[in-house]
Amino acid sequence: MESLSSLYRDHIATLQQRTREILQRQQLEGLLIHAGEPISRFLDDHDYPFKVNPQFKAWFPVTRVPHCWLWVDGVNKPKLWYYLSIDYWYLVEPLPDSFWTPYVDIVPFADPDEIAALLPPRDNVAYLGSSPHRASLLGMERDFINPQPVLDYLHYHRAYKTDYELACMREAQKSAVNGHRAAKEAFLSGMCEFDINIAYLSACGHRDTDVPYDNIIALNEHAAVLHYTRLDQHTPEHVMSFLIDAGTEYNGYAADLTRTYAAQKDSDFAALIAAMNSEQQALIATIETGVNYIDYHLQMHGRIAKLLKQFDILSGLSEDAMVTEGLTLPFLPHGLGHPLGLQVHDVAGFMQDDRGTSLAPQSRYTHLRCTRVLQPRMVLTIEPGLYFIESLLAPWRANTFGRHFNWSRIESFKPYGGIRIEDNIVIHDNHIENMTRALKLE
């Protein structure tokens, strides 16, 4: 594989080309990209964990240092004003010296309020960042603060990963897979959710503030809460299932993986997990360029109908009728997946072009996060689920179609919560790369 340095050189060239294009289109002279500022807790002297502007970390892996500024014009070498505070209370991140630093001019400064005097004139420059107030203090007018046409263009093209970005995402997969394996062992040894999470973080080398989203570590019926993050400190008396949805970051790029396990390998739930895994892999085998992601979401509902019929959860209707009448929806209430990259739910999932044209999902699939036609270099998650959630099932009990639900069978599955299996894939011209399965995470 090429060195990260050479991949990064080409990555910067791509970002520079995109910058030239949008500056010319909007008649701008440059982009001023702000890393962001710490946010203090209300009536407190502590800050929330700092999360960098994704538009900033697209250019280089500076993810922990607030108050930094980047100036790009698509022609000259990108210029980074790097916040190097003088502080004895907190650790000061040293001036970077890494594979990416030869491609950037770095200017250290110690006082965030100095920046106005350090920056070039800003009369025809767009500010991209989370602090419009700071931009106003720099004399920038409202129309130049996060202008939508600039954001639309940059967001749209972020879907197409450079080779550098793909290399970073493959590295993120490796650490996430290490964490998932450690978490599975912790589950099998009888640990509680809290301790399973610690095992995961330790294996990944991440703190809980480093992971790209709050880990979902769910035993038993907790798996029926889609974004369950409580982390119980007591192991249930009868452990039946384990769902883990957890990721990592590498150079600012995310991995997002999910697996579900049964405590008893000979249970019906274990068989349902195995069948779901087969359907997920079969769906991935059908993915190709030029097809809208919506089509695969609809295909998965057909596969869910097949499972519901196979396991006697629904009966008396064809699989097509189950989908048409919405009977699969309470079992799979979320979308098939989403774009992945600098953010877990990466931007522009609905954008059809780089001018902001949006295509919303069908009204019955409001939680689908991607309606784009799949093209090479896109990275997406494929994460079908099958859950037993009473609040979603309850309306069907008195419904005309309620007789098609095997309610006693559903009650027997409720203590397991549900299933989700998630891989991260890359679209290539002639094949689909499953980054997760390539590392043998089963």
Swiss-Prot record:
Cited Gene3D superfamilies: Creatinase/methionine aminopeptidase superfamily, Creatinase/prolidase N-terminal domain
GO MF term list: aminopeptidase activity; metal ion binding; metalloexopeptidase activity; phosphoric triester hydrolase activity; proline dipeptidase activity
Protein name, as recorded: Xaa-Pro dipeptidase
Binding site for Mn(2+) 1: D256, H338, E383, E422
UniProt entry tagged with the keyword Nuclease: no
Entry note: cofactor: Binds 2 manganese ions per subunit.
Gene it is expressed from: pepQ
UniProt cofactor(s): Mn(2+)
Entry's Gene Ontology cellular component terms: cytosol
Keywords: Dipeptidase, Hydrolase, Manganese, Metal-binding, Metalloprotease, Protease
EC number: 3.4.13.9
Binding site for Mn(2+) 2: D245, D256, E422
GO-annotated biological processes: proteolysis
Catalytic activity, reaction form: Xaa-L-Pro dipeptide + H2O = an L-alpha-amino acid + L-proline
The family this protein is said to belong to: Belongs to the peptidase M24B family. Bacterial-type prolidase subfamily.
Stored InterPro entries: Creatin/AminoP/Spt16_N, Creatinase/aminopeptidase-like, PepQ_N, Pept_M24, Peptidase_M24B_aminopep-P_CS, X-Pro_dipept-like, X_Pro_dipept
Pfam families: PepQ_N, Peptidase_M24
